[in-house]
């Protein structure tokens, strides 16, 4: 962008903030270059989520001094290996890791029914690198209940169903590419980390990740699913060529996993918006994919209205109750992937799916045995 264009966009954002014009802010988040810088994102992200000063103060008043919580050890381990890709000096590294532990501890101590998953810390660290703690904490809590709650259940149910929706979007937008993927027996596990971390785990350039966060926070939760699908759609030619070369599902899966590293973020957002126009959210068969009526994908209204229209904690509890009822229903067929629950206890379930995803990729790096010795 030219200096004149940057200045004009800054002024447009500042005026929208002064006028509480969230519709204009949402439009900017979906178009062009987003919100540009930390100083603007601090106010814009909070405004787009409908977070009041009172709500922020309530979050900050919560204590972290009470007893331990279910996944405290895992949170500590994830915090200790976080921020490494951003080349911070030792002082800032210690500061941010301490803040990350505190932020996640506040959330999980206050809401013990939530299940931590490995990958949530990737989202949290972007918030802490972009916002002061006073803004990052309430925003994290908001995202947990209005954007990420499907991933915070004690089974893989919500996560797997969202992964399946990625293929549904590809099928609706590009049936030919969809058929190629199905014939190659490609599942959407390659997109697992994209989906549950909002690409923060896969993209090392923080400016690109923040631009994606601008887009996602300005939009409906289904936008993340569509963006995952769009990454695949934008690489259809290379994918089909790999299949024509008989490269095999293993090589293709490995190729797909690495796609986010080279995305053109503004072009990706533009193309995703075009796909949303061509395949509206309302046309996506959520019922066919058994998406819970309490899922965040069922949010109605604009993003800044979610808190006033619904109670995220209540919806999470209803989703949890529905899951437990389904689990104990006679004759219910439990997908094989859910049997991992016998191995991983409740709060570790979504960490388990990350392990499963990593295992799928790792297995492709092991040479297959041959008959020659």
Curated annotation (Swiss-Prot):
A single GO molecular function term of this UniProt record: GTPase activator activity
Does this UniProt record's set of keywords contain Transmembrane helix? yes
* Compartments, record wording: Endoplasmic reticulum membrane
User: What keywords would UniProt list here?
Assistant: Endoplasmic reticulum, GTPase activation, Membrane, Transmembrane, Transmembrane helix
InterPro entries membership: Rab-GAP-TBC_dom, Rab-GAP_TBC_sf, TBC20/Gyp8-like
Any one GO CC term of the record: nucleus
Question: Is the keyword Cell membrane in the record?
Answer: no
- Where, by residue number, does the polypeptide cross the bilayer? 343-363
Boundaries of every Rab-GAP TBC domain copy: 35-220
| Membrane topology of this protein | Single-pass membrane protein
Query: What biological process terms from GO does the record include?
Result: endoplasmic reticulum to Golgi vesicle-mediated transport; septum digestion after cytokinesis; vesicle-mediated transport
Name the job this protein performs: Has a role in vesicular trafficking and septation during cytokinesis.
Give the protein's recorded name.
GTPase-activating protein gyp10
Report the source organism. Schizosaccharomyces pombe (strain 972 / ATCC 24843) (Fission yeast)
Q: What gene is it encoded by? A: gyp10
């Amino acid at each position: 962008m030219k200096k004149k264009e940057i200045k004009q966009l800054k002024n447009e954002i500042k005026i929208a903030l002064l006028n509480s014009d969230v519709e204009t802010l949402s439009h900017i988040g979906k178009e062009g270059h987003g919100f540009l810088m930390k100083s603007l994102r601090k106010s814009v992200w909070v405004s787009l989520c409908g977070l009041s000063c009172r709500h922020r103060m309530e979050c900050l008043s919560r204590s972290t001094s009470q007893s331990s919580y279910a996944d405290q050890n895992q949170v500590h381990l994830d915090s200790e290996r976080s921020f490494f890709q951003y080349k911070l000096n030792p002082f800032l590294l210690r500061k941010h890791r301490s803040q990350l532990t505190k932020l996640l501890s506040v959330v999980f101590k206050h809401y013990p029914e939530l299940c931590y998953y490995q990958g949530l810390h990737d989202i949290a660290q972007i918030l802490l690198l972009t916002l002061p703690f006073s803004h990052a904490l309430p925003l994290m809590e908001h995202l947990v209940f209005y954007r990420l709650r499907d991933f915070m259940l004690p089974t893989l149910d919500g996560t797997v169903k969202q992964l399946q929706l990625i293929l549904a979007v590809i099928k609706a937008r590009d049936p030919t590419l969809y058929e190629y993927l199905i014939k190659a027996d490609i599942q959407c596990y390659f997109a697992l980390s994209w989906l549950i971390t909002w690409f923060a785990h896969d993209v090392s350039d923080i400016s690109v990740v923040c631009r994606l966060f601008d887009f996602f926070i300005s939009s409906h939760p289904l936008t993340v699913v569509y963006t995952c699908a769009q990454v695949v759609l934008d690489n259809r030619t290379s994918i089909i060529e790999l299949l024509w070369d008989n490269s095999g599902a293993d090589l293709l899966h490995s190729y797909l996993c690495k796609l986010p590293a080279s995305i053109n973020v503004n072009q990706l957002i533009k193309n995703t918006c075009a796909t949303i126009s061509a395949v509206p959210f309302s046309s996506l068969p959520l019922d066919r994919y058994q998406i819970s009526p309490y899922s965040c994908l069922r949010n109605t209204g604009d993003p800044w209205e979610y808190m006033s229209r619904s109670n995220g904690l209540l919806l999470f509890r209803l989703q949890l109750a529905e899951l437990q009822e389904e689990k104990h229903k006679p004759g219910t067929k439990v997908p094989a992937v859910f049997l991992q629950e016998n191995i991983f206890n409740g709060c570790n379930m979504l960490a388990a799916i990350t392990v499963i995803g990593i295992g799928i990729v790792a297995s492709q790096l092991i040479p297959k045995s041959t008959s020659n010795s």
